[in-house]
């Protein structure tokens, strides 16, 4: 990914560093409008996810996470920007006339061919079951439930690694560092998700952040006591507690937030690294 730096003509562009713009001209039959209601609120109107609201209107692109066009070769026609994710997407024209969007694999260019199915070549962008992949293969868009579509390793630059196969399960090392078991019959896509340098971007100004639907972040210590447990006091006061807490009074910074007794506890061999 090429990073574009602006001339320092204004304060807004002085610290701005964005990727070279990939145009977006989506197909009408692969998009639909979505009503982004709530903006971080639940059904009762209470804030459950902070710092969200506003933002530009978006059209949702239908992404093929299942890759169920078996043994039919497709050609990459375009590489487009998707406002709903930080990874790019590719428009695929299949041999039977079907047209679908998929996540852009790193290194894929316009004109490359891809295919999904069993016993297909181990090539970047191809999708096949884990049982047909050799150990050490870099993969993304991994299924958890057979036939449901890829749910793991879908963000920009994400990549997992197949490290073992035993019995009916395969052992994967996920981008978070977690090591877990998944059925060998589940499918995944070979390669890494594109747009690897997304973390090198710098929006440079608050207005660009608002376009993305992200509101300003305010520290709890500068709020009033009615708004946050850290708030209140005369001048710059400490939080007044032994440990920092969330706005709802729960312990923050280090406490495990994963629910207990989940079905997948037995499938996780090693917790994710912090």
From Swiss-Prot:
Q: Indicate the family of this protein.
A: Belongs to the universal ribosomal protein uL2 family.
What SUPFAM superfamilies does the annotation carry? Nucleic acid-binding proteins, Translation proteins SH3-like domain
Principal location listed in the UniProt entry: plastid
Which Pfam families does the UniProt entry name for this protein? Ribosomal_L2 (PF00181), Ribosomal_L2_C (PF03947)
Q: Where is this region: Disordered?
A: 1-23, 224-274
UniProt keywords (A-Z) are: Chloroplast, Plastid, Ribonucleoprotein, Ribosomal protein
What InterPro entries does the record tag this protein with?
NA-bd_OB-fold, Rib_uL2_dom2, Ribosomal_uL2, Ribosomal_uL2_bac/org-type, Ribosomal_uL2_C, Ribosomal_uL2_CS, Ribosomal_uL2_dom3, Ribosomal_uL2_RNA-bd_dom
Q: Where in the cell is it found?
A: Plastid, Chloroplast
Q: Which GO terms describe its cellular component?
A: chloroplast; mitochondrial large ribosomal subunit
Name used for this protein in its record: Large ribosomal subunit protein uL2cz/uL2cy
User: Which SMART domains does this UniProt record tie to the protein?
Assistant: Ribosomal_L2, Ribosomal_L2_C
**Residues of the signal peptide:** none
Annotated PANTHER family:
LARGE RIBOSOMAL SUBUNIT PROTEIN UL2M, RIBOSOMAL PROTEIN L2
Q: How does it assemble?
A: Part of the 50S ribosomal subunit.
State a single Gene Ontology molecular function.
RNA binding
Q: Which organism is it from?
A: Vitis vinifera
Q: Tell me where the transmembrane regions lie.
A: none
A GO term (biological process) for this protein?
A: mitochondrial translation
Q: What is the lineage of its organism?
A: Eukaryota, Viridiplantae, Streptophyta, Embryophyta, Tracheophyta
Superkingdom of this protein's organism: Eukaryota
């Amino acid at each position: 990914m090429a990073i574009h730096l602006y001339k320092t003509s204004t304060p807004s562009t002085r610290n701005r560093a964005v990727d070279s713009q990939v145009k977006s001209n989506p197909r009408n039959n692969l998009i639909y409008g979505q009503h982004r209601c709530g903006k971080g609120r639940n059904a009762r109107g209470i804030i459950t996810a902070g710092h969200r609201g506003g933002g530009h209107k978006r059209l949702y692109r239908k992404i093929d996470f299942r890759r169920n066009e078996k043994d039919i070769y497709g050609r990459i026609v375009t590489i487009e920007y998707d406002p709903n994710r930080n990874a790019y997407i590719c428009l695929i024209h299949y041999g039977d006339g079907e047209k679908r969007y998929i996540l852009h694999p790193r290194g894929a260019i316009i004109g490359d061919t891809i295919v999904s199915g069993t016993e297909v070549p181990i090539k970047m962008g191809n999708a096949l079951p884990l049982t047909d992949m050799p150990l050490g293969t870099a993969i993304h868009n991994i299924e958890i439930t057979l036939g449901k579509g890829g749910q793991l390793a879908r963000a920009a630059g994400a990549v997992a690694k197949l490290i073992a196969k035993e019995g009916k399960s395969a052992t994967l090392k996920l981008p978070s560092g977690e090591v877990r078991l998944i059925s060998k019959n589940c499918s995944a896509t070979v390669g890494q998700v594109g747009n690897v340098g997304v973390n090198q971007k710098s929006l440079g100004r608050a207005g660009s952040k608002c376009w993305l639907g992200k509101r300003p972040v305010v520290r709890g210590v500068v709020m009033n006591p009615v708004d946050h447990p850290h708030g209140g006091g005369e001048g710059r006061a400490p939080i007044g507690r032994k440990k920092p807490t969330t706005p709802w009074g729960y312990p923050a910074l280090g406490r495990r937030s994963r629910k207990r007794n989940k079905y997948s506890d037995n499938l996780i061999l090693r917790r994710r690294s912090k």
